[in-house]
């Protein structure tokens, strides 16, 4: 568990503890959990749908990051379609999408998402054996727009450690209590205490449905938005995320600058998961800067780290 922060004077300082305390808008990395709402409540379309935009009465057009063509659930994960997730959120309200509509989002619709996300470890404690673990921020505004944002990971915030719980649950079908301690040995080398590896909850959908999400995640790394992140020496699965966020640049209590943050989670080997990695890179692009370039820090870090882990442990 590692964290580094670049200060205003160009120095890196340790930021490791913030992995369990600070929370961030995670973006599309959580779509494996939000699409589970579709599986749980039988909302997944039976045929491929054409990617597009949603326009509600109270919103501007809300679209994917580019036009992604026809897709099923796995393809929607591979290329990180926002539109697919929007339609699931609208169907959850009992409505069929028409341009300019109101969907009548209620607190109950938000709680359906949050309960599913919680079963994956998002928005709740991981149980890690460290003090002052955070659970993130839950938005309080109940609007049609925010329900759609919830569906793509652009509303509530999550800690990096909770994102790790989520990726582990996708990989193994169960959410285990996280721990930095495996065992304690006596002076003679015998095991004095061993971690019990406690299961906190099960994945909230069937194994068949979970396998579809896993295949979508495999496609992310094989030919989708996560292509080139993990060494090709091992079969892997993963999910990228990008989110809009805001910061207070001069500590005056006023959030005054729009930024972009990125996330990525992966596990491998795909067929017998042993390793998972999550990276969160907050505020890597400021919207008021002249350059729109966004440094691919997640891919650079994951590529190097995964290669070293594979060589050492697999």
Task: Locate each region found by the language model.
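Short, surface-exposed linear patches
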Residues: 99-100, 173-174, 235, 259-260, ...
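Extracytoplasmic/secreted cell-surface and envelope-processing proteins
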Residues: 85-87, 97, 286-294
């Amino acid at each position: 568990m590692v964290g580094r922060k670049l200060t205003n004077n160009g120095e890196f300082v340790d930021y490791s503890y913030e992995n369990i305390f600070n929370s961030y808008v995670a973006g599309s990395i959580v779509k494996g959990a939000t699409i589970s709402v579709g599986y749980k409540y039988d909302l997944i379309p039976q045929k491929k749908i054409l990617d597009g935009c949603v326009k509600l009465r109270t919103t501007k057009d809300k679209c994917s990051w580019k036009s992604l063509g026809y897709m099923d659930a796995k393809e929607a994960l591979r290329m990180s379609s926002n539109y697919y997730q929007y339609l699931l959120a609208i169907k959850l309200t009992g409505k069929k999408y028409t341009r300019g509509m109101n969907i009548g989002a209620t607190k109950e619709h938000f709680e359906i998402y949050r309960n599913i996300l919680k079963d994956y470890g998002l928005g709740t404690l991981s149980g890690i054996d460290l003090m002052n673990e955070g659970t993130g921020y839950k938005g309080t505004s109940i609007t049609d727009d925010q329900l759609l944002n919830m569906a793509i990971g652009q509303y509530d915030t999550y800690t990096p450690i909770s994102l790790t719980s989520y990726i582990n649950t996708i990989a193994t079908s169960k959410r285990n209590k996280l721990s930095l301690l495996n065992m304690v040995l006596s002076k003679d080398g015998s095991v004095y205490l061993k971690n019990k590896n406690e299961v906190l909850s099960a994945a909230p959908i069937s194994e068949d449905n979970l396998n579809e999400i896993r295949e979508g995640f495999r496609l992310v790394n094989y030919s989708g938005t996560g292509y080139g992140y993990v060494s090709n020496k091992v079969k892997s699965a993963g999910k990228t995320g990008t989110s809009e966020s805001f910061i207070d640049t001069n500590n005056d209590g006023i959030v005054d600058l729009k930024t972009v943050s990125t996330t990525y989670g992966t596990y491998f080997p795909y067929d017998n998961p042993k390793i998972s990695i999550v990276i969160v890179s907050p505020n890597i692009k400021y919207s008021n800067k002249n350059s729109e370039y966004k440094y691919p820090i997640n891919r650079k870090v994951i590529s190097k780290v995964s290669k070293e882990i594979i060589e050492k442990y697999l």
